[in-house]
Amino acid sequence: VKAAEISTKARRSLGVGYIGLAHYLAKLGYGYSDKKAWESVDRLSEAFQFYLLKASNELAQEKGKCDKFDRTKYADGQLPIDHYKKEVDEIVPHKQRMAWESLRKDIAKHGLRHSTLSAQMPSESSSVVSNATNGIEPPRALLSIKKSKKGPLKQIVPGFPKLKNDYTLLWEMPSNEGYINIVSMMQKYFDQAISGNWSYNPLKFENNEVPLSAMAHDMLTAYKLGWKTSYYQNTYDFKGEEEEVQPAGLMAVVEEDAGEEVEMDLKTHANGLHVVNGLEPAVENLYENNAEDDGECEACTI
């Protein structure tokens, strides 16, 4: 479509985001509720956005700025560090580590090749293909059996077994506070809105019911800290689109069901893994094929 081509070339919008944040934090030994995790994501996101802008600026010097650059905040001399919600500094005090003022001058002089650069996508399919954790989300279990049109897909978290005790699992989180804070640190620097998710485990509430006050608190906190939008509200009900293998000793799980939804218990023994319901061979294959995660990821050194 010619009109779409004209608009696309005029703005050259990009949406670059994260895949495997849970793995990144597990390698650092941080849980989603740890302040060090929030500080790490703050540091990572600042460098992430800075170098996206720097690369786009260098492309603008080489190929010219995008036609509609003048319609962006960047053309007005504004950077993400200028207009984020300052309440986020209550979580992690603001600290500039990058040469933002030098970059501001370069952008004012040469512009940017792209009108937008960063966005956080769900990345469900990409994560499966690359055997990474899903976007910025905590995994629901160490081993998941995901349904698809071509049959069940077994996926184990990266770095297992070395990192199995360092992962934050979704339904183990005491609250959404850590996740909300992490998304807030990202939104501080990202130039497009992030649609975050809220997750509730009724087993952690009185009478196994999630009170409206808890949901209202999360919504207002997210708004206060700079969230623009939210997407899923997940509730743990022992069913869903994924069949999950839960770590032993965490909570009761449904082992058998009359329908297609089945959740199985993952049990750790001294001599390795054993999975009830006859899944042991499948788990052993995943265990063997999942390489040791001894190296330090490049992002960890930022």
Predicted regions and their residues:
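Catalytic alpha/beta core of large soluble enzyme barrels
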Residues: 65, 93-97, 106-265
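Core structural elements
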Residues: 7-29, 189
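Internal maturation/activation junctions in enzymes
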Residues: 1-5, 9, 13, 31-123, ...
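Acidic, low-complexity intrinsically disordered tails
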Residues: 244-302
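Extended, hydrophobic alpha-helical segments in both membrane/secreted and soluble proteins
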Residues: 17-20, 52-56, 215-218
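Short, compositionally biased low-complexity segments
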Residues: 21-30, 154-162
